[in-house]
Amino acid sequence: MTNTPSSAPSPLTYRDAGVDIDAGNELVERIKPLVKRSFRPEVMGGLGGFGALFDLSNKYREPVLVSGTDGVGTKLKLAHQLNRHDTIGIDLVAMCVNDVLVQGAEPLFFLDYFATGKLDIDTAAAVVGGIANGCTEAGCALIGGETAEMPDMYAPGEYDLAGFTVAAVEKSELKDGASVAAGDVLIGIASSGPHSNGYSLVRRIYDRAGRPAELELEGGVKLVDALMAPTRLYVKPILSLLKSHGAAIHGMAHITGGGLTENIIRVVPEGLGLDIQASSWTLPPVFQWLQKEGAVADSEMWRTFNCGIGFVLIVAPDQVAAVSEAVKAQGLDHWTIGQVVTAEGAERVHIG
């Protein structure tokens, strides 16, 4: 080896550039038990391969695969601000699997993407632990993921998340809203809070109010706990409902960005609209606080937040009592919130 001139630059390593491969390996070892806990019998192999394997051969006759991807929006900014990282992964899973559930599909497996400027192993492990917990609750295998350490891309201490899921449903049992008809009834199932939508407005209101971290809402729940409550996972109870009352359920909607105004109508055929009675349920305290502190108009609330309704079933009118009883048996708070009506033109949703 030739001698290095004294004027030559000192040798650099990847760690010098801001990427710590050893930290990434340590993270993988720490999360392995959590990830394996989420596995289903169909998972083939373990972690660390170039591709994750899943055997679909024995469960479905005519499977239709349903895929979904999502993030948690600027709820992440609030998580960073409050240093709460253990449940944001549940939000990530729920945002993805609740979406594919709308088609009647069972989530099979999930992959995550975690990106940060400098990897903090404790923070990343807390986040992935939440993802694994969410997958376990949804019956969905956390089959793989990517941890990207990218110096100079993110503010110190911050990270971004994305999730991806694949689900399956028998072709004959696919829910696409085609059977929705005038007279069908809307059953709204309770949310756990704002879930993961509207947080740019939430944070603006929270900041304008002086970030009242210790404020207690009606009922004794702290405001920050209500704002950070993880998105409710509807997978297991809804799949159970579909097995027992699938023919009675003509359509479903996950109430995400766009709120009640824009989500239910996505599964309603042209020529039909929605008449939603806002008085049929009580606006939860966290939404009451947001509306009052932000002086937010009713129409803006309906279009931004779920307002206490996280998932909606569109049900045949003669089956409402039976489906309501089945929802109750699943331990879910719910209300009859409106019906499908004939409607022409641009204004197809009425909330009053």
UniProtKB/Swiss-Prot annotation:
One Pfam family linked to the record: AIRS
CDD domains, per the entry: PurM
Pathway noted in the entry: Purine metabolism; IMP biosynthesis via de novo pathway; 5-amino-1-(5-phospho-D-ribosyl)imidazole from N(2)-formyl-N(1)-(5-phospho-D-ribosyl)glycinamide: step 2/2
Catalysed transformations (reactions): 2-formamido-N(1)-(5-O-phospho-beta-D-ribosyl)acetamidine + ATP = 5-amino-1-(5-phospho-beta-D-ribosyl)imidazole + ADP + phosphate + H(+)
Main localization category: cytoplasm
Record's keyword annotation contains Transport: no
Enzyme class name: ligase
Any one of the GO BP annotations: adenine biosynthetic process
Signal sequence residues: none
Record's keyword terms, sorted: ATP-binding, Cytoplasm, Ligase, Nucleotide-binding, Purine biosynthesis
One GO cellular component term noted in the UniProt record for this chain: cytosol
Gene Ontology MF terms: ATP binding; phosphoribosylamine-glycine ligase activity; phosphoribosylformylglycinamidine cyclo-ligase activity
Subcellular locations according to the entry: Cytoplasm
ATP-binding recorded as keyword: yes
EC number: 6.3.3.1
Similarity section: Belongs to the AIR synthase family.
Annotated protein name in UniProt: Phosphoribosylformylglycinamidine cyclo-ligase
Gene: purM
